[in-house]
Amino acid sequence: MALQMKQSPSMGVRRASQPVLPPRPIVHRGVGSVSRRPAVVVKASLLDAASAASAVDAVHHATQLYTLAEGGPIDVLAQFFEFVLQTLDEGLESAKIPYSYGFAIIALTVLVKVATFPLTQKQVESTLSLQALQPRVKELQAKYADDPENLQLETARLYKEAGVNPLAGCFPTLATIPVFIGLYNALSNAAKEGLLTEGFFWIPSLGGPTTIGGGLEWLVPFENGAPPVGWANAAAYLVMPVLLVASQYASQKIISSQNNQDPSQQQAQAILKFLPLMIGWFSLNVPSGLTLYWFVNNLLSTGQQLYLKATVKVNIPEAIKAPATAGSSTPIVKPKEERVKKVTGKELGSRKKRRNDDGEEVEDVEVEVVSSGSSSSSGSNGASGRKGEKFRALKAREAAAKAASTVSAGAGGSEEGKDNSA
């Protein structure tokens, strides 16, 4: 009976936490009967039920995520690209063109580059405008080297006057990311559905050598001294990744050759130096149809960059684009020490000579000055010198008059004493 009381609460908890499982019926034993079921078995059954419930919850959660992703915008875009690929493939097949699906991938890549050409043009215009303003930016950096706050304000004012938005080049790149993801999903779905089974020139199959998530199982480990797909197929599949890495390096070299003087561009080039190797490694883990798309897209992007940099004109006034010089209308602020002219002893001597013997001022002599700032300072120094001379002459006259009055007073007193004595 004690065992029955111990089982009832445990089964009650199980019913509360796991409603999907039916409750175990309680078996009433007769008087004198003893339950032989150990407690460990009861705990094991509870753990099995909990594990089963966790697995059910995990499957349900994964199903919900799959349902949400299936109707998302990226999935809709991927389905649209799949439809375009299928339409192009059928059209090329009806025209009796061999390797129809490979040429359909190339045609889709060209259509996408044409559709995103305005965004690419906007990006190149923004990049060229920023490059044209680099001399002024460097001038501001040298001028406000110890004042980052004013440097930021003056740089923002410069961009505003030139009508340039530094972030404008990022928006076209961000806008093309969903397109790339949609194309990637479309080609991945085509490979999973077996639509990329045909080859393309030397490539045995556009769906090979691996599937999504298959990794490098087609290349390693070796079996009987050869890759799993054989040496001939492995060499054929490796040609496209090698071409992709080479084209990526050539594209970086061509595009970055015009920006070697920009330190920020040099730093970015050093960081992106290993990007082609990463892309090449990734191309070994996906179907060859995706590698073909990346290769063609890379060639078209390089051609677009060269064409736009040769044809796009930057509309920035020369007064804003060129650095400030001595002959320009932009004033150059000089240090205070250069603006104030020091008065020399020779100039003070010439000012003293401009007075006659009676201390009266004579006609002023014209003094040559170097700059307007120095003339104003020397004029003020001359005025203060003349005021000092007048003050000293006045004091000398007062002292002479006082001495004369003292002497005359003493002489008058001595004569009065003589008269009294007489």
From Swiss-Prot:
TM annotation in the entry:
65-85, 97-117, 167-187, 226-246, 276-296
Kindly report every residue range on the membrane side named Stromal. 86-96, 188-225, 297-422
Q: Which PANTHER family match?
A: ALBINO3-LIKE PROTEIN 1, CHLOROPLASTIC, OXA1
Q: Where is this region: Disordered?
A: 1-22, 325-422
Residues folding into a coiled coil are none
Descriptive protein name: Inner membrane ALBINO3-like protein 2, chloroplastic
Q: Where is the composition biased (Low complexity)?
A: 368-380
Task: State which gene encodes it.
Answer: ALB3.2
